[in-house]
Amino acid sequence: MSIIFSVGIVILLLNEYYYHVVLKNKPEHKILRGLKNKYDMIAFGSSYGLYGISFPKDSNGFNFCLGGQFFYYTDKMLREYAPRCLNSGGTVYLIIADLVFAEVGKGLYNSERYPLILSKKSLGDEYSLLNYLRMRFPFFFNRRALRQIARTMIKGVDNGFDTLTLNQLNYEETLQQAKKRCFSWCQQFHLNDTQTNKIPVELEEKFSRTCQILTSMIQFCYDEGYKPVLVVTPVSSAMNECMSDAFIKKVLYDNIEKANVMAVPFLNYLRDGRFQDISLYANNADYLNARGRLLFTKELIIDSKYISQ
């Protein structure tokens, strides 16, 4: 009996090490740590926010963006986290990715992660105890966990994109990454290309629904006394080369205009010349590296303070 008990303790300790150390840089884990404090400014959104925002230490801000996320879950995170973590009158940056209006997102794109970071009240009938257990006790559900623990003990925690400060790709390689991104969008959203403004009828229907969600998020911020700011993050010159003005207007700007009925501040950096240099990106064409994120966020804070005066 004592042997079984001892083995159980060892396994639980391994899980805690795996959860708190090996996975410490996972966005979900950063979010959980971020929920322990109060801030003057917070950001919500998807991958473009995750790899676009890095608040300087003296700014008292936190980035709650999560990769592969659409407005459905962003809305839930905003409503649960802002009252808990944002100081009265604080700023809410709503990061709007190029194709974020193209999908509502319910039950899609790693939705099993949300029971770890959102309450049962927020998720309603989507809440799954099994998914919570999978996320909270990952050692028991990952056959590679022991190998990852050993690698972490030897080499240290994997920081991924967190510390990358230079794009190791040349322009042609970065352009190829941009083309791959656009091709994946065409596959995912059934687009002909990223040059025309003609899109499928079903996408128009999703635009209508996602615009309503964004309008609701803006209204929530006003009702709670927060300062919402809509933000389109920059992408490199290589990425911009692959997207026409007509396409971006159709899938992004027209939807922002439709959703922003309260005319809240909108800061658009998509083609901003200050952030076109490919050296600011993380071995791709549209995710800023650590240096680029910090430079951009400093400018974002300055600009948002200016427009609020």
Model-derived segments and their meaning:
Residues 38, 87-91, 225-227:
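A general structural motif
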Residues 48-136:
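Membrane-embedded segments
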Residues 40-46:
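Short, hydrophobic beta-strand segments that form beta-sheet elements in well-ordered domains
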Residues 282-309:
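Histidine-centered active-site loop/cap adjacent to the catalytic His
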